Design a protein with these regions (language model features):
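Conserved active-site and cofactor/substrate-binding residues in soluble primary-metabolism enzymes
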Residues: 3, 33, 37, 110-113, ...
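Acidic/His- and Gly-rich active-site-bordering loop/insert found
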Residues: 1-103, 124-129
Length: 422
């Protein structure tokens, strides 16, 4: 597999140079030019490797290998916004220090290309799959899955498969995902402007406000940047499913104004201090997490968009009952049911075997708070690329994937595909 490493690394680096975060739609480009160009690049590479490819209206593409009952590998090429705090060009695709740097390196352009070149390795060694491997690459995973909805309208989604967009050894369960917008009225607001966050599923790393009366000493003591009459708090971005890995810039900004308004204290109590016990909900898949990722002051109220990941065995009503106890208006922006697969099923067992073959580790399947395309399948799981002990880089500044991990993914994915489609 080593002879494909150089090509894989180069392709990942090239792909990172496309800013494929969601942007304004253009003609025949539903998620913007960057996403469409990135999809074209991926499919062009696949075609050059000798595979049949399809581009479904720049929503989603697929690469075909083999004949028979379809088996899915579901990856995505879109990314979250770069955010702040980078020490390298987030869209440079720089290869240095044994790593490929840039937004999407780990989530999910790197793994997508590893799956593609794993298929190429199997093809070149003469392996003929007894099933049709469909490598499906979407362009709207981070913002609503319109790509998958479109695919299901124009093509046939396989029943089973895996998504290289989670973690190892195998992810058998994913928490439910609920995005809500909470509306907090603020009487006599002590600010004229308050805004923070870039994405609903990314911990806010920058928040700005314009106080009616600027307390310079207090602002400096809290570590805020002062720009004319505006104050700026800085945090650290992270994936909203693991908010503890980041530092939310919204919280200190709210605390700055807390002593001036009971309404501000209420916001803190609801979304940061867990006064109503949302985070007490838990099961075998873990506890509920709540990440307030976006905030805006509009028409006399603070609107806060929260990303909630709730335990996989609990009903949605367990969460909405707690939200109702807050006594504030809220609206549901997005909901995805949890995923639970059989730990002892063939899919999980074969993937664990492939993982063990290249790591030497006998491991058990895990549950996560992240949401992957595996939910689009009747029998789907997430399989890599993250491993226990990895530095958190997904949705963080200075995202990267190591060349060592790229090589490992090439081997594991090739082995897994052979086991599941022979």
């Amino acid at each position: 597999m080593t002879h494909f490493l150089k090509q894989t690394v180069e392709s990942i680096s090239e792909s990172i140079r496309f800013d494929s975060s969601l942007s304004s739609p253009a003609a025949d480009m539903p998620f913007g030019k960057g996403a469409a160009d990135c999809l074209k690049h991926f499919l062009d590479r696949a075609a050059a490797l000798g595979f049949e490819t399809h581009n479904y209206d720049n929503y989603v593409g697929e690469v075909i290998f083999g004949n028979g009952e379809p088996f899915a590998v579901l990856a995505h090429l879109d990314v979250v916004p770069a955010g702040s705090g980078w020490t390298r060009d987030p869209f440079g695709g720089e290869i240095e220090d044994g790593r490929i740097w840039g937004r999407g390196a780990m989530d999910d352009k790197g793994p997508a290309f590893c799956a593609l070149y794993a298929m190429k390795a199997l093809k070149d060694e003469g392996f003929v799959p007894a099933r049709t491997i469909k490598l499906i690459v979407g362009c709207n995973e981070e913002n609503g899955w319109a790509c998958i909805d479109h695919y299901k309208k124009v093509a046939t989604m396989p029943e089973d498969g895996f998504s290289p967009d989670g973690g190892f050894p195998v992810i058998y369960a994913e928490k439910g995902i609920l995005h809500v917008r909470l509306h907090f009225p603020v009487k006599n607001a002590p600010f004229t402007f308050f805004e923070g966050g870039e994405s609903h599923n990314m911990v806010c790393d920058r928040c700005e406000a314009t106080p009616r009366t600027l307390a310079v000493t207090r602002a400096r003591a809290m570590g805020f940047e002062i720009r004319n009459k505006k104050i700026v708090s800085h945090g650290k971005s992270a994936h909203a499913s693991t908010p503890e890995q980041g530092v939310n810039a919204i919280e200190p900004m709210l605390r700055y104004f807390e002593d001036k308004s009971e309404d501000i204290k209420r916001v803190l109590d609801c979304v940061f201090r867990d006064k109503y016990g949302l985070k007490t909900l838990r099961d075998e898949t873990g506890g509920l997490t709540l990440s307030p990722d976006l905030i805006k002051y509009r028409r006399g109220e603070l609107q806060v968009v929260c990303d909630i990941r709730y335990p996989a065995t609990l009903p949605l009503s367990a969460v909405t009952e707690k939200l109702s106890e807050m006594g504030v208006k809220y609206e549901t922006l997005r909901h995805q049911e949890p995923l639970m697969q059989d730990k002892d099923g063939t899919l999980v067992k074969e993937l664990l075997a492939a993982y063990e073959a290249y790591t030497g580790e006998k491991a058990q399947p895990l549950a996560i708070g992240g949401g992957t395309y595996a939910r689009a399948l009747r029998c789907g799981v997430a399989f890599g690329p993250e491993m226990e002990g990895d530095e958190p880089v997904i949705h963080h500044a200075d995202e990267y994937i190591t060349l060592e991990r790229v090589e490992l993914l090439l081997n594991i994915y090739a082995d897994a595909l052979k086991r599941l489609t022979k």
